[in-house]
UniProtKB/Swiss-Prot annotation:
Species name: Yersinia enterocolitica serotype O:8 / biotype 1B (strain NCTC 13174 / 8081)
Family statement: Belongs to the phosphoenolpyruvate carboxykinase (ATP) family.
Protein's name according to its UniProt entry: Phosphoenolpyruvate carboxykinase (ATP)
Lineage of the species this protein comes from: Bacteria, Pseudomonadati, Pseudomonadota, Gammaproteobacteria, Enterobacterales
Pathway in which the depicted protein is active: Carbohydrate biosynthesis; gluconeogenesis
Gene name for this UniProt entry: pckA
EC number: 4.1.1.49
Binding-site residues, ATP: 212, 231, 247-255, 296, 332, 448-449, 454
Its biological purpose: Involved in the gluconeogenesis. Catalyzes the conversion of oxaloacetate (OAA) to phosphoenolpyruvate (PEP) through direct phosphoryl transfer between the nucleoside triphosphate and OAA.
CDD domains linked to this entry: PEPCK_ATP
Binding site for Mn(2+): 212, 231, 268
Length: 539
């Protein structure tokens, strides 16, 4: 079966001209050679580590740059996108004019013209009926490596008939000198055009912009078809029972869904349709700060040849110091999903989810380590999306900061949050799924809840022990909390017990409850939202 490939004429149709060479869907061995060439300079050059993986630096952008995200406002997006200027809550969907888009596209295509380019054709979505066929164009070898790791790799037979639905042109080396007069945030840009089905990247080298860019597009397209689009990890047990884990970056999605007793469907982005839960991706993008073989053996052993490390400190002998966060706390590794042994094969999808877990990192030390949610509480806490932003996943965030992020992923929502909540709850109700709120953050001791206790809590959810446990109701938040769970320190289940004086918890709880209420006000302009207020905290 011959691979279709791409011609200079096709690139010319995108505005890229006089390309010196096209390296189409390079193999991992070729990428290894390309990204370690001694002639490479700056952020293009990769360093071989003693793990066998290549390490690269992404410069000043060691996380996404949400303030530089734009979507062209036109006939298609005008009345569908959840725009940042509607005053209905924080999101990053700033409108862009067609005129400015044309200018940005010119900057990127000029940057890529006349160069030796890497073109990688991939799928986003494991379900053949709804997947996007995405073509990435870049002049940087390791960026091609990143998308080969993170997206689904087509077979030669699939490549023979590949017709891209979406084009991503990465012009990391170019910047926009006209940003001030165009009313933009900075010289850097991550811009989307849903009519042209294209993403442009300029000024930032961070690999995650390509990954999350396509997630934002799936978040636009799927819910409009009644398919849940979710910022979650997912795994499946021996009996076919599926669990999904929602949570912002760093709350434990990847760690907790990587379980030796269960097969991994995926670690970050999924859909849920009439057939069940399916992965959008073909790889994992795990945080590596303070990574150890003992705490996270699966991720640790996935860091080998073909994995790509970002912004880690590499010692002169090639050793990686995972404890060194001097470049960023948001050190990462991408690797193809088959680097994890315990995965769903051959396609990353399974049946319907029966357990839905909301992960939160409570910086206030108020919420219990686990609680069982009612149907209305499920919608309330999904729309609230309370967590603490953890260090380094966005520029300018270095300490844990309490935040509310709708659907545990407001930064990636292209539609109004209520649309995601409605689709999720509909899917849950159809199969009788149960939701739980799990706090992986802090308590009154000032310390983070141990991974050992959190893992035991997850085990109790997955094996059904939590549903047999006696519960008490935590005041203010009205949460049903188990009194005891196997393998969990009983002293932490009631957060009030972790304080020397319960009045300290009460004061913090009232403060947090007010924040929940204030945040949720923006959803009460609809009857459905107003009906959920009673599921929230009461002071």
């Amino acid at each position: 079966m011959s691979v279709k490939g791409i011609t200079p004429q096709e690139l010319a149709a995108y505005g890229i001209h006089n390309v010196s060479e096209i390296v189409y869907n390079p193999s991992y061995d070729l990428l290894f050679q390309e990204e370690t060439k001694p002639t490479l300079e700056g952020y293009e050059r990769g360093t071989l580590t003693n793990t066998g993986a290549i390490a690269v630096d992404t410069g000043i952008f060691t996380g996404r740059s949400p303030k530089d995200k734009y979507i062209v406002r036109d006939a298609i997006t005008q009345d569908t996108v959840w725009w940042a200027d509607q005053g209905k809550g924080k999101n990053d969907n700033k409108p862009l004019s067609q005129e400015t888009w044309t200018h940005l596209k010119g900057l990127v295509t000029n940057q890529l013209s006349g160069k030796r380019l890497f073109v990688v054709d991939t799928f986003c979505g494991a379900n053949a009926d709804t997947r996007l066929q995405v073509r990435f164009v870049t002049e940087v070898a390791w960026q091609a490596h990143f998308v080969k790791n993170m997206f689904i790799r087509p077979t030669d037979e699939e490549l023979a008939h590949f017709e891209p639905d979406f084009i991503v042109m990465n012009g990391a080396k170019c910047i926009n000198p006209n940003w001030k007069e165009q009313g933009l945030n900075s010289e850097n840009f991550v811009a989307f055009n849903l009519t042209e089905r294209m993403q442009l990247i300029g000024g930032t080298w961070y690999g995650g912009e390509m990954k999350k860019g396509m997630f934002s597009m799936m978040n636009y397209l799927l819910p409009l078809k009644g398919i849940a689009s979710m910022h979650c990890s997912a795994n499946v047990g021996e009996k076919g029972d599926v669990a999904i884990f929602f949570g912002l970056s760093g709350t434990g999605k990847t760690t907790l869904s990587t379980d030796p007793k269960r097969k991994l469907i995926g670690d970050d982005e999924h859909g849920w349709d009439d057939d069940g839960v399916f992965n959008f991706e073909g790889g994992c993008y795990a945080k590596t700060i303070k990574l150890s073989e003992e705490a996270e053996p699966d991720i640790y052993h996935a860091i080998k040849r073909d994995a790509l490390l970002e912004n880690v400190v590499v010692l002169p002998d090639g050793t990686v110091d995972f404890n060194d966060g001097s470049k960023t706390e948001n050190t990462r590794v991408s690797y193809p999903i088959y680097h994890i042994e315990n995965i769903v094969k051959p396609v990353s999808k399974a049946g319907h989810a029966t357990k839905v877990i909301f992960l939160t990192a409570d910086a206030f030390g108020v919420l219990p380590p686990v609680s069982r949610l009612t149907a209305n509480q499920t919608q309330y806490h999904f729309l609230s999306g309370f967590t603490a932003k953890l260090a380094g996943t966005e520029r300018g965030v270095t300490e844990p900061t309490p935040t509310f992020s709708a659907c545990f992923g407001a930064a990636f929502l292209s539609l109004h949050p209520t649309q995601y909540a409605e689709v999720l709850v509909k899917r849950m109700q159809a199969v009788g799924a149960q939701a739980y709120l799990v706090n992986t953050g802090w308590n009154g001791t000032g310390k983070r809840i141990s991974i050992k206790d959190t893992r035991a809590i997850i085990d109790a959810i997955l094996n059904g022990e939590i549903d047999k446990a006696e519960t008490f109701t935590l005041p203010i938040f009205d949460l049903a909390v188990p009194m005891a769970l196997p393998g969990v320190d009983p002293a932490i289940l009631d957060p009030r017990d972790t304080y020397a004086d319960v009045a300290q918890w009460q004061e913090k709880a009232e403060d947090l409850a007010k924040r929940f209420t204030t945040n949720f006000d923006k959803y009460t302009d609809t009857p459905a939202g107003a009906a959920l207020v009673s599921a929230g905290p009461k002071i």
